[in-house]
Amino acid sequence: MPILVDESYLAKPLGEAIVKSIHGSHKKVLVIGSTDLTHYPSYENAKKVDQDAVEAILSLEPEKIDDMNKHWLGKGIPNLHCTICSEAAVKTVMRIAKSLGADTAVLLKAANSGDVSIGYKDEVVGYAAIALVQEAS
């Protein structure tokens, strides 16, 4: 079931409601969150900001996204519109995953639109694929 969320303050209550629904279903569930990372900085700036955004997500601590945002958005980087396009979606999925037992985040791939052979490097969009999982004990 697709759910769109655009306000960070909804991450906690939405995550809690989804976890409650998952527990009540007694089914195996895969939760997927989707968003872009940086929007429109230069290639080099995007690499730095995206790396920090990825590290914040890998921490499994949604608050680190807020700290990372304050740091980068306060620097006045030209054309940097956001560090994580839908931070609300990311925070919601982080909360769901942790509530369901995720204790590890694994970076699968990170890149930006400037990485393709015909990629324009003056203004790029960042991307990453990250799995939030429970390590086998």
Description of each model-found segment:
Residues 1-30, 40-137:
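Flexible, D/E/H-enriched segments
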Residues 37:
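Active-site metal-binding loops of divalent metal-dependent hydrolases
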Residues 34:
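Generic enzyme active-site microenvironment
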